[in-house]
Amino acid sequence: MYSISFQEDSLLPRERLAKEGVEALSNQELLAILLRTGTRQASVFEIAQKVLNNLSSLTDLKKMTLQELQSLSGIGRVKAIELQAMIELGHRIHKHETLEMESILSSQKLAKKMQQELGDKKQEHLVALYLNTQNQIIHQQTIFIGSVTRSIAEPREILHYAIKHMATSLILVHNHPSGAVAPSQNDDHVTKLVKEACELMGIVLLDHLIVSHSNYFSYREKTDLI
């Protein structure tokens, strides 16, 4: 009896999706489809609702580790891995959509986008965004991921991708895992070096952003270095 109910647990939302479209489904139903089956103690709908009840918002699901997912009743290692894979794929799709020929209108707009991408990272990430003459992003490159004490990559590496993608300008973005966005002396030094190197190559350094989960610092807005 149990095996039959397990197999049919998520059948109804699947049928609804096929008939009414994915937009018609609730978060619980979508999660039930991904989880597929319940347990002897709880249906897949109950498990899906328990997962959602543990979140203050859907974005919290993206932040959960494998261990945290497995700690939820009804989710084993395989389901936790499948959920993480689904979440990451959705994140990459969203990233590609927002990146593809996006026009940069303001530091604030870009900072908000990069806060979502880098704000919760536990290590420092340096990212370079390369733009064309219409200020549209044509390429995004992670220059390095590492300790906050490590020196940022040489300007040569940053400019390599600018030349490769025929960019006319670029924007640097890095996160401060501490949450404080005030620039360090090293941040100032790197900004000066990259700007000087860009000028030699006829490329414009539009901005250098420092982001955290809830705040940002713009060299263009706050300093005379750019």
UniProtKB/Swiss-Prot annotation:
Record GO terms (molecular function): metal ion binding; metallopeptidase activity
Protein name from the UniProt record: UPF0758 protein SP_1088
Disulphide connectivity of cysteines: none
Transmembrane segments: none
Hydrolase found in the keyword field: yes
Motif (JAMM motif): 174-187
Sorted UniProt keywords: Hydrolase, Metal-binding, Metalloprotease, Protease, Zinc
Family membership: Belongs to the UPF0758 family.
Protein species of origin: Streptococcus pneumoniae serotype 4 (strain ATCC BAA-334 / TIGR4)
Chain ranges of the MPN domain: 103-225
GO terms, biological process: proteolysis
Chain residues that bind Zn(2+): H174, H176, D187
